Structure formats: C-alpha cells, structure tokens
C-alpha cells in the first residue's frame, strides 16, 4: 500500500507534464500499471478472477 501523502501528491497536477506518472487507482502502486485499465497487475489479476473486468478471461493454449 502506498503512503497516503504520496497518493495525495500524485493527484495534484504537476508543474511540468513530464513529471506525471501512472499509479494504480485502487492501491496506489506506482509500478506495473496497465494504462488501459489504470490499475496495477496485482489488482487486475484479482478483479479478473472475480469476473469484474468485462471481456477479460484467463489465457489458455
């Protein structure tokens, strides 16, 4: 879980656009965030297993 201060700092618009970075909308994790969904791989996996992400299913080959 990310510190609350970092999450609040991330929500504010940065002075320069290059300073912007992605964070998970659920847990605040800064790494391995899927841009399409806006959540990290860990939260994505949990939601996918629950069936809460439409059109997403486990790969099998």
From Swiss-Prot:
Q: Name one GO molecular function term.
A: rRNA binding
- Residues that bind Zn(2+), according to the entry? 24, 27, 40, 43
SUPFAM superfamilies, per database record: Glucocorticoid receptor-like (DNA-binding domain)
The record's note on quaternary structure and interaction partners says: Part of the 30S ribosomal subunit. Contacts proteins S3 and S10.
- Name the gene behind this protein: rpsZ
* Name recorded for this polypeptide: Small ribosomal subunit protein uS14
One GO location term (cellular component): small ribosomal subunit
Q: How is the cofactor bound?
A: Binds 1 zinc ion per subunit.
Which organism does this sequence originate in? Clostridium acetobutylicum (strain ATCC 824 / DSM 792 / JCM 1419 / IAM 19013 / LMG 5710 / NBRC 13948 / NRRL B-527 / VKM B-1787 / 2291 / W)
Q: What does this protein do?
A: Binds 16S rRNA, required for the assembly of 30S particles and may also be responsible for determining the conformation of the 16S rRNA at the A site.
Q: Which GO terms describe its biological process?
A: translation
Q: Name one Pfam family in it.
A: Ribosomal_S14
Q: Which cofactor does it need?
A: Zn(2+)
Q: Which PANTHER family match?
A: 30S RIBOSOMAL PROTEIN S14 (PTHR19836), SMALL RIBOSOMAL SUBUNIT PROTEIN US14M (PTHR19836:SF19)
Q: Which UniProt keywords apply?
A: Metal-binding, Ribonucleoprotein, Ribosomal protein, RNA-binding, rRNA-binding, Zinc
By sequence similarity, the record places it as follows: Belongs to the universal ribosomal protein uS14 family. Zinc-binding uS14 subfamily.
């Amino acid at each position: 879980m990310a510190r609350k201060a970092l999450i609040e700092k991330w929500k504010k618009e940065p002075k320069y656009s290059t300073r912007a970075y992605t964070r998970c909308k659920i847990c605040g994790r800064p790494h391995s965030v899927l841009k399409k969904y806006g959540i990290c791989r860990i939260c994505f996996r949990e939601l996918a297993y629950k069936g809460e992400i439409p059109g997403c299913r486990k790969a099998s080959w």
